[in-house]
């Protein structure tokens, strides 16, 4: 039975990643560029391949990603979320392993909004006693 290509969406902060997994040689393409070309930081690259390594699919699947919004760190997290969802669609047996590692859960942390009467979300203006 041939493995079908499947599309999934991953999100983190303001970033959205549309991920497509295809049987192949392990190439990861993000917005038409290679992973090494797109991400300068080694930690971002490590974040991407974590789910593939966990289920031993590294080098067996090609990953095509369209990432938009947010910064590079948020996009890396969104891509990891998308890859995890795609792997579960590919093989439902991967779900418990990926869920235990925390890759199936959408990271809900986001920037706290700025409040009025303050310079930021939590910071206060300088207090003068006299």
UniProtKB/Swiss-Prot annotation:
| Keyword set, alphabetical order | Ribonucleoprotein, Ribosomal protein
Q: Which Gene3D superfamilies would you find in this protein's record?
A: 3.30.230.10
Task: Tell me the superkingdom of the source.
Answer: Bacteria
- What Pfam families does the database record attribute to this sequence? Ribosomal_S9
**Database matches in InterPro entries:** Ribosomal_Su5_D2-typ_SF, Ribosomal_uS9, Ribosomal_uS9_bac/plastid, Ribosomal_uS9_CS, Ribsml_uS5_D2-typ_fold_subgr
Q: An example Gene Ontology cellular component term from the record?
A: cytosolic small ribosomal subunit
An individual GO BP term:
translation
What are the protein's GO molecular function terms? RNA binding; structural constituent of ribosome
Q: Which family does it belong to?
A: Belongs to the universal ribosomal protein uS9 family.
Which HAMAP family does the record match to this protein?
Answer: Ribosomal_uS9_B
Q: What name has this protein been given in UniProt?
A: Small ribosomal subunit protein uS9
Q: Specify the species.
A: Anaeromyxobacter dehalogenans (strain 2CP-C)
């Amino acid at each position: 039975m041939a493995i079908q290509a499947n599309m999934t969406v991953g999100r983190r902060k303001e970033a959205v990643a549309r991920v497509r997994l295809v049987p192949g040689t392990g190439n990861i393409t993000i917005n038409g560029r290679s992973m090494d070309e797109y991400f300068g930081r080694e930690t971002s690259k490590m974040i991407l391949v974590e789910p593939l390594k966990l289920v031993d699919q590294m080098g067996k699947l090609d990953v095509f990603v369209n990432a938009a919004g947010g910064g590079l760190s948020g996009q890396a997290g969104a891509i990891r979320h998308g890859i995890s969802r795609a792997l579960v669609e590919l093989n439902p047996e991967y779900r418990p392993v990926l869920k235990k590692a925390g890759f199936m859960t959408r990271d809900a942390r986001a920037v706290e909004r700025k409040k009025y009467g303050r310079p930021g979300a939590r910071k206060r203006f300088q207090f003068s006693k006299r």
